[in-house]
Amino acid sequence: MRRLIIVVSLLIATMMSTTGASAQTNAKPFVVPELTQWNGAEGTMALSGRVVVSNKKLTKTAQDLCRDYQLETGKTMTVVQGKPGKGDIVLAIKQDKKLGKEGYRLNISETCSLTAASTDGAFWGTRTLLQMLKKQSNLPQGKAVDIPQYGIRGFMLDTGRKFFSISYLKNLIRVMAYYKMNTLQLHLNDNAFKDFFGGDWIKTPGDFRLESDTYPGLASKDGHYTKAELIDLQQFAESYGIQIIPEIDSPAHVLAFTHYRPGLGSKEFGMDHFDLENPEVYTFMDNLFKEYLSGKNPVFRGKYVNIGTDEYNNATEELREKFRAYTSHYLELIKKYGKTPILWGALSHAYGRTPVNPKGAILGMWSPFMAKTKDMKADGWNMISMPDWTVYTVPLADYYHDILPNDNIYKNWTPADFGDTKLKEQDPQIAGGMFALWNDLYGNGITVHDVHLRIMPVLQAMAVKCWTGQLTTVPYDSFETQRKELGEAPGVNESGCVPNLPVKISDLQPNKTLSLPVHEVGYGHKISFSIDCKPEQKGTILTTGPDATFYLSDPVSGKLGFLREAYFDHFDYALPKEGHVEITIENTSSATNLYVNGQLKEKLEQIRFYVVKPTDKANHMPGRTWQLDAYEPKRSMRYQRALFFPIQKTGNFNSRVTNLTIDKE
């Protein structure tokens, strides 16, 4: 009997051991940013299709989850109140000091419990659930505690030198929210380099992108935001957990203001600098800030306002002291309006005696040559980490990254790294981290699509390093592969990806609106069509989209050509007046290629424009007629001719167009 008991016991132990070996706990699910803590369990939870809320404050969060889940999967969920059941997602607010304002807990078993101390934390938790459900219909069982390592996790977009539509900014906000990036800074004024405009400040573009009643006509005619539009944009961002930081940059980068009021410009250092000896400068800027910050419902709604202060000349002691006084004045002015001022770090560059009070303000630390981290920390400044050589992108520039390699960010950087100094992780004086995209090179052919292409990979890497920080465990190669599978955000396709290729239209009729999944075909595709040619007038359009037009006969030369935003380019090829032709357009991220009857006809690749002296024939750029009006032969810039092919509407053409096909390049 004793022997039988021993045998049975051994058999049970063996069975238990075998069962334990075969059962596997769920690995940490891949989401961006990476979860800061995960304890996997066994099995998955099938969704019931219900989102249960007990607190009315979470109703909108639940509705947002249902909306975005449907956009992502085509399936529906319903918001309900009452007792949770199997497969329900349950949202709750519970006081939890450990979580802070933005952290949350997940407990996924028979139900999925998402608890947070605030609606912000709950919203971020729903972004995690959406990513988990991106490629699978069930949720992995387990527990997560997810808490951001840094408060400000952001991106700065230069809208001063390049205008971006409200519709694009709203999509950008959706993308940022999907990756828990909570801060968008809009750089609202700036100017081009005068070298590219004949060395003449009057000819050099300078733009301010916000409507002003105080100074009618100040806002740029080629694109600006009304005050109502900016208020609406901020409210939209707030609904996604994002704060917008408006930036009005001065006392340098002010050409828009000195074009408007020439007497404010510096005769010694150029019109892109204010003359700080002129008291009218203070009057002008005081009134501008008053317009946007005064009253019960100010135009600048958020907690932060950026006052600029970067790259002003520091040639003399007197100039440095005037700059410091100017900086101090606007820090205190912004504080009087109840806001927290942010400024670009420049106080090592502008060293001096005039006090600049760090209390209640934040430095954007972008260059150790302008502001030394150890000195600024010792002086008591709170700081945003955004070291230029690590996190700056300048499209088509030769002096900064054109396309930022995000492997360095992911492998080596956190907001504790300021470029010249690494502070202790989560040092209380580190406000957070940001990256920036600057449109320095005015007129370089870069479109909103090219900008977005440069933003996306970096945004995902920055999201990880600002939220998860030093707790990151996913190897870079794995991150780089899997991040692409998450897409941009529910309902967002700024990359122009075309699903279910190939897409075919057998007979393209003129003057029609097309029902295709995209309005413009993104890079990495080829668009082919057959055309039985008839005479076409100059300006005859094949297709149009939100940002582009493709011509069968362009309005200038009568050749195949296209318009992207304000940029016009054409091939050196005109369709015959009769006969059959096969056309293929390849659109890559750096070129637009034309094939005629299967043969490569022309590549419209990037070209370099040299700044030339008008009287120096030897330096004249051959080829294209588009030239820069400038004089310095040592300066140059690249010009891009890449096309998102428009496919929203057809034009009024005479020729018969058939077999239009969209496929992979």
Where do the PLM segments sit?
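Acidic, contiguous N-terminal accessory segments
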Residues: A21-P148, P341-A350, N357, E485-E488, ...
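Flexible, acidic glycine-rich loops studded with aromatic residues
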Residues: P355-A361, P368-Q509
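Extracellular glycan-recognition modules
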Residues: P502-L563, G651-E665
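Short, aromatic/His-centered strand-loop micro-motif at the edge of beta-sheets
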Residues: G561-T584
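Flexible glycan-contacting loops in extracellular carbohydrate-active proteins
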Residues: E602-N659
